[in-house]
From Swiss-Prot:
The keyword Acyltransferase applies. Mg(2+) binds at D101, N226. It comes from Alkaliphilus metalliredigens (strain QYMF). The gene is glmU. It is found in: Cytoplasm. One of its GO terms (biological process) is lipid A biosynthetic process. It catalyses: alpha-D-glucosamine 1-phosphate + acetyl-CoA = N-acetyl-alpha-D-glucosamine 1-phosphate + CoA + H(+); N-acetyl-alpha-D-glucosamine 1-phosphate + UTP + H(+) = UDP-N-acetyl-alpha-D-glucosamine + diphosphate. Its cofactor is Mg(2+). Keywords: Acyltransferase, Cell shape, Cell wall biogenesis/degradation, Cytoplasm, Magnesium, Metal-binding, Multifunctional enzyme, Nucleotidyltransferase, Peptidoglycan synthesis, Repeat, Transferase. This is Bifunctional protein GlmU. InterPro entries: Bifunctional_GlmU, GlmU-like, GlmU_C_LbH, Hexapep, MobA-like_NTP_Trfase, Nucleotide-diphossugar_trans, Trimer_LpxA-like_sf.
């Protein structure tokens, strides 16, 4: 079966009150349209055609390679949207029609819809669900034999039809040839003067062909987004699904409702996520890690047995059994080795810290290469910027940098060298040497009495 997906994404999204095209609003880190494209591909669609309109250029910039677009210059209804994609509809195979603002649709639901469509030998099949409050949706009107009679748009419903709870999801499965032949027959004889895709089903029925209705129990799959409130509702549902998937794979969430984790994140078995954790982008966390409360990790790789306490980690790599935080900040291109400690209020940027080294507290480590078993004392500053460009600091294995020292780059501290506390180091420190870069202490006896300070 040759399958194509047509995704309608031309709407203005007026109720979103946004300068951004509606389908580009994100749910769990990915655009709504991106979610729908992914599910289409997972359902084995050989080709995805996105119908763009409002903000067409912005939408096109976000699309993955291979996804085609057609322009609906005027938004004249769902039928018209599919009409502008007619050149991509062939005379054999199957066409799925989806919406770019419905990010919760699943591969399982689409596969079930297509199986029902194929096994029933239907020319068209509509996906439906029953809602407690169907306001805003088109209604499924059935005949006395419980088969589809017609679909009535919300704005065209009678008082009696408004009471119907079975709604049209807007998702359809068509025989390609039948759809191609039916599109030119759709008229705009309605109060809105729009071309409704629902009319295609009526035409297909009138021509004696079979139209199926596939009703799902989980209405969440077909939730659409037309407002910020609905965006939040959809985000909540997707978060719940993501968390459930991770828990089933052996991840512990101390408080699932307060944890934010994007769809693209990977987490290993027996890792524990505490309340307030935020995991984003291409983050990968290994097994047996503990991610403490209010930690934020983006596009980073954490290996096994790592503990992170209330820290921020951006585009960095952390090797096995390192400890980070509390309140550490790892900025992009940081690589933390095995059994390394990066303690409280330590900031690391574009730096490598090799195995068993530690910076326990209150340090800035920028543009640096630090060897094994190195100690960085409290208050150490890597002075990496001269006002024009950044410079690198290299510290070799087993070196020791005392508290409150400034290392003015470019500089190298050789193996097993020591830097005395309070020093400002401006040139290389040889292996095994002690570097002292501070003025000698001078005590002025009797100074307090002479100045008359201290006592009142």
């Amino acid at each position: 079966m040759k399958l194509k997906a047509i995704i309608l994404a031309a709407g203005t999204g007026t109720r979103m009150k946004s300068k951004m095209p509606k389908v580009l609003h994100k749910v769990c880190g990915q655009t709504m349209l991106g979610h729908v494209i992914d599910v289409s591909k997972d359902s084995k669609a050989e080709e995805c055609i996105v119908v763009v309109g409002h903000g067409a250029e912005e939408v096109q910039k976000t699309l993955p390679e291979g996804v085609k677009t057609v322009l609906q210059a005027e938004q004249l209804g769902t039928g018209h949207a599919v009409m502008v994609a007619e050149e991509h509809i062939e005379t054999q195979g199957t066409v799925l029609v989806l919406y770019g603002d419905g990010p919760l649709i699943t591969e399982e639901t689409l596969n079930a819809l297509m199986t029902y469509h194929q096994e029933g030998k239907y020319s068209a099949t509509v996906l439906t669900a029953e809602l407690e409050n169907p306001t805003g949706y088109g209604r499924i009107i059935r005949d006395d034999d419980d088969r589809l009679k017609t679909i009535v748009e919300e704005k065209d419903t009678t008082v009696g039809e408004k009471e119907v709870r079975e709604i049209n999801s807007g998702i359809y499965c068509f025989d390609s040839k039948v759809l191609k032949e039916t599109l030119p027959k759709i008229q705009n004889n309605n109060s809105q003067k729009e071309y409704y895709l629902t009319d295609a089903l009526t035409i297909i029925k009138q021509e004696g062909l079979k139209v199926g209705v596939y009703q799902i129990e989980n209405y969440e799959d077909i939730m659409a987004v037309n407002s910020r409130e609905q965006l939040a509702e959809v985000e909540e549902v997707m978060q719940r699904r993501i968390v459930k998937k991770h828990m089933e794979a052996g991840v512990t969430f101390i408080d699932p409702q307060s944890t934010y984790i994007e769809k693209t994140v990977k987490v290993g078995m027996d890792t524990i996520l505490h309340p307030g954790v935020i995991l984003k982008g291409a983050t990968e966390i290994g097994e047996d890690c503990i991610i403490g409360h209010n930690s934020r990790i983006e596009n980073s790789i954490l290996k096994n047995g790592i503990e992170v306490q209330s820290s921020t980690i951006i585009e960095s790599t952390i090797d096995d059994h390192a400890t980070i935080g509390p309140y550490a900040y790892l900025r992009p291109q940081s690589h933390i080795g095995k059994h390394v400690k990066v303690g409280d209020f330590v900031e690391v940027k574009n730096a490598t810290i090799d195995d068993h080294s530690k910076a326990a507290h209150l340090a800035y480590i920028g543009d640096a290469e630090i060897g094994k078993h190195v100690n960085i004392g409290c208050g150490v500053i890597f002075v990496n910027y001269d006002g024009i460009k950044k410079h690198k600091t290299i510290i070799k294995d087993h070196a020791f940098v005392g508290s409150n020292s400034n290392l003015v780059a470019p500089i190298t501290i050789q193996e097993s060298a020591f830097v005395a506390s309070g020093s400002t180091i401006t040139r290389e420190v040889p292996a095994g040497a002690l570097a002292v870069g501070r003025s000698r202490q001078e005590n002025k006896e009797g100074w307090v009495a002479r100045k008359g300070v201290g006592k009142k």
